[in-house]
Each structure stands twice: as structure tokens, then as C-alpha cells.
Amino acid sequence: MDFSVKVDIEKEVTCPICLELLTEPLSLDCGHSFCQACITAKIKESVIISRGESSCPVCQTRFQPGNLRPNRHLANIVERVKEVKMSPQEGQKRDVCEHHGKKLQIFCKEDGKVICWVCELSQEHQGHQTFRINEVVKECQEKLQVALQRLIKEDQEAEKLEDDIRQERTAWKNYIQIERQKILKGFNEMRVILDNEEQRELQKLEEGEVNVLDNLAAATDQLVQQRQDASTLISDLQRRLRGSSVEMLQDVIDVMKRSESWTLKKPKSVSKKLKSVFRVPDLSGMLQVLKELTDVQYYWVDVMLNPGSATSNVAISVDQRQVKTVRTCTFKNSNPCDFSAFGVFGCQYFSSGKYYWEVDVSGKIAWILGVHSKISSLNKRKSSGFAFDPSVNYSKVYSRYRPQYGYWVIGLQNTCEYNAFEDSSSSDPKVLTLFMAVPPCRIGVFLDYEAGIVSFFNVTNHGALIYKFSGCRFSRPAYPYFNPWNCLVPMTVCPPSS
């Protein structure tokens, strides 16, 4: 279309009031046409100022509001002009209202949108605060710039944290690898005995490694995701700041809300206290226990049970290694069971030197074992036995079991109550409660006659020391002592190195 012709046509369809292309044109009797919104606004002003009289804004010819008529012909021309006007320059669409075809030159604060003056008069924006674009551009630009700088700074911090976590993750891997090597080296020194213990520690280490490294990996993923979100916002803000005022202000409230609400969430750091989980266990202590057990096992003697010391209440096996109760005894407060009912001595007796033996007590719920050395002739009728009945007077039951009377023993009652019996100032022994990390199925007994020591070892728990009597005074030979009590499960003396 020839430019001059285009200009003439566009002039004919331009509203004399807003100087924009006609929108919903209305024509007066004088022949002039206006946008419906424009002439309606003028009529309202005339009603207030001129007491209801209206005149054409161009030629001042008076008219009645009811004589306004829609001009569809002009409306069609306007649409054709818009098509011709907009198609060559697609970029102009950004500056024109898509609803009314008017220039976008007003900013609605409530909606955060750039609108035309027709939109401003519409019901949608009624009562909203509106400003000319040039009135708010600088303030909005400053806010966007502040938001951009804050996000860039946060992103830089996130990048640094990501690098720190990456380095920390590597350090943790190296540290764990070193600890793994220590554990492997330590357990290799006692592979035969502690293979199960080694596997347990390695499993704990690997679980801790997975936990720590997974947490650090999750922290890295979280930071990567946050950086992606920040990058999207940064790109949006940079695009707006590079673009036109309309591009910058369009939907700016949403962008501002997202940028202001975005805050770097720092991942939780791995507690340094967790390093204790990865430390090699106290292998030296465990090795010391094993060494002590190995040392005393050097003195292992083949103890046999003495049938001559047994009563009809117990039975000793043919190989003289096992004793069990064959007749249970009912305990009464007034008449506690005779001590001799269950007690059995070893055939061997020791008056010097060092000796060691082991006893299998698997499955038993009661027993007493240790060392006995005769002190003086005691009336067996006054001795006492072991009781399960809660009504039994324990002071009578345990009165014999004390070093003063020649007994250095430990015992089990009621399935899980382990005790040692020491001297006391009263007539009753001092009953000590023993803690067992692992219930013993096999117990080692060590006697050092000259040193006056009787020690008990939990062979089931790598030879952990159960209890140790020191300062024992042996005036006569010492005998191994066994008492299965009225528990029908047998107790067995183990052959050396079995």
C-alpha cells in the first residue's frame, strides 16, 4: 500500500480524542466519529460541567447522547488498517494492547501489567493505582537490579559451597579409605579368632560411608537444583533489564515475588562427630584380652571329675568329664539343701604352680564353679546349697561360698543372674553382680597358686575377663570345683585345646 494513502486512511480512522485507532467507533450526527470509551467519558464530563448538554469535541455541534450510533464500516476499516500496520513490524505488537489495539503506556501497580488507557477505564482495572510508564520505570529498574545482584551473590555462594562439599566428599572418601585399611590390617593380626568381628566392623564402616557420602551427594544435588532455579531467575531478570520498558514491566510483580522469595537453602553439613563411627575399634584392647587368654591357656591341664566326691544326687560320665543332676532338691527356708548334694571336685589337686581348665555350661540356668581349698573341718550339715525359690533365705544358701571358707567361685542363678562371692564382715558373703556382654557358654578358670590368683574368663566372648580373685591364701592344696545344682542340663570339663 502506498505510504501516503496509508497515512490518509489511518487519519480517517483515528480518534480525535485519544489519537489512536478507533475502538468500537461511535458516530455523531455531525459526521465525526470517536472511540466508544472516549466519547462516553466526554459525555460524562459534559453532564457535570454543562448540566447535561453535550457537544462534538471537534466541531462543537450539540448532540443528544441517545443519537450516538455504532459505525461498523469504520470498525472494519480499522481492523484492515491494523492488519496492514502490524504485519510488517512484528516487534510493534509488544507496544500495543492486544485487546484494544491502543498503545501500552500505563502501568497498573496492583496487577503489575502494562496496559492501554482503554484498559485503565475498564471494570477490570477500576480503582487500581495506575502510573505513566516513565514514572515507574526507574524505581522498578532499581528493584530489579538489587534483586539481580542479590541472586548473583547467592549463586556465587552456592557455587563455593558446592565446591567445598565436593572437596569435603573427597576428603571423607580418602579418610574412610585410610580407616578401612587400618581395620583390615588390625583384623589380619587376629584373622582366625576375630573374622566375624572384622566383618561386623567393616559393615558398620560401609554403612556409615554410604550414609555420609549419600548425604553429601544429596547436598550437592540440592545445590545444583537451587543453582538451576537461580539461573532461570537471573536469565529472566537480565532479559528484562536488556529489553524495553514494556518487556521489563510486563508481569514484573510475579518475577519480583519469585526473585525475592528465592533464598539459598544451605544443606546440612556432616557432623564431624561421625568420624568416631569410622575409627578403628580398640583392637589393642581386644588383642590384649586374647593374649591374656592365650597366655593362661598355656597352663591348660586335663582335669577329670572325681567320682568319689559325688553323691547320689549327681551322675558323672564314664569319661569323667561331665556331671549332671539326677535328683532335684526342694529348698526350704527352715531346711536348706545340703551343700554336698551337688558339689563335685576334680581328681587333681594343686599345691604350687599355674593351672588352667575350661568348663562348658551351655544351656544351663544355674551353676557354680571355681576353686576350693580346705580351710578347716566344717560340719557338712551346716553347709548350704543353691536355691531357686524366692522364699529361700539367701544368707543361708550362700554362707559357704566365700574365700574365708575356702571357696573362690562364681555362679549363675535364674538363667541370667551372674555373681561372684567375696568375704564380708558379716556372716553372709558379699554377693557381687557380674555383667556379661555375651552370656558365657564356656568358661575358663586360671589358678596361680603362688601368686594367690583365681581368674575366670568368658571364652565365648574372645576370652574377656569375668572376675579375678587376688590375694588368695591357700594353706592346703586347691581343687577344681564344679556344682551343677538342681539344673538337669550337664556341665562338662573340656579337654585341653578343644
Curated annotation (Swiss-Prot):
User: What SUPFAM superfamilies does the record point to?
Assistant: B-box zinc-binding domain, Concanavalin A-like lectins/glucanases, RING/U-box
Question: Which controlled-vocabulary keywords does the entry list?
Answer: Antiviral defense, Coiled coil, Cytoplasm, Host-virus interaction, Metal-binding, Nucleus, Repressor, Transcription, Transcription regulation, Transferase, Ubl conjugation, Ubl conjugation pathway, Zinc, Zinc-finger
EC id? 2.3.2.27
Pathway field of the UniProt record reads: Protein modification; protein ubiquitination
The record's section on Pfam families has: SPRY, zf-B_box, zf-RING_UBOX
Residue ranges annotated as zinc fingers (B box-type) are 92-133
Q: A Gene Ontology MF term for this entry? A: identical protein binding
Induction info: By interferons alpha and beta. Up-regulated by p53/TP53. Dramatically induced by progesterone in MDA-MB-231-derived ABC28 cells and T47D cells. By interferon gamma. Expression is also modulated in response to several viruses and viral antigens.
User: Could you name the domain of life of the organism this protein comes from?
Assistant: Eukaryota
- B30.2/SPRY domain mapped to chain residues: 283-498
Q: Which reaction does it catalyse?
A: S-ubiquitinyl-[E2 ubiquitin-conjugating enzyme]-L-cysteine + [acceptor protein]-L-lysine = [E2 ubiquitin-conjugating enzyme]-L-cysteine + N(6)-ubiquitinyl-[acceptor protein]-L-lysine
Tissues in which the protein is found: Strongly expressed in peripheral blood leukocytes, spleen, thymus, and ovary. Expressed at basal levels in other tissues.
Localization = Cytoplasm; Nucleus; Nucleus speckle; Nucleus, Cajal body
Q: Do you know which CDD domains this protein is assigned to?
A: Bbox2_TRIM5-like, RING-HC_TRIM5-like_C-IV, SPRY_PRY_TRIM22
Q: Does the keyword S-adenosyl-L-methionine apply?
A: no
Start and end residues of each RING-type zinc finger? 15-60
- Post-translational modification comment from the UniProt entry: Auto-ubiquitinated.
Question: Enzyme class, one word?
Answer: transferase
What information about domains appears in the record's comments? The C-terminal SPRY domain is required for the transcriptional suppressor activity, probably by mediating correct nuclear localization. Residues 491-494 are essential for nuclear localization and nuclear bodies formation. The RING domain is essential for antiviral activity and for TRIM22 nuclear bodies (NB) formation but is not necessary for nuclear localization.
Report the family membership: Belongs to the TRIM/RBCC family.
Q: How does it assemble?
A: Homotrimer.
PANTHER family given for it? E3 UBIQUITIN-PROTEIN LIGASE TRIM
> What is the protein named?
E3 ubiquitin-protein ligase TRIM22
User: What is the species listed in this Swiss-Prot or TrEMBL entry?
Assistant: Homo sapiens (Human)
Its organism's taxonomic lineage begins at:
Eukaryota, Metazoa, Chordata, Craniata, Vertebrata
Q: Gene that codes for this?
A: TRIM22
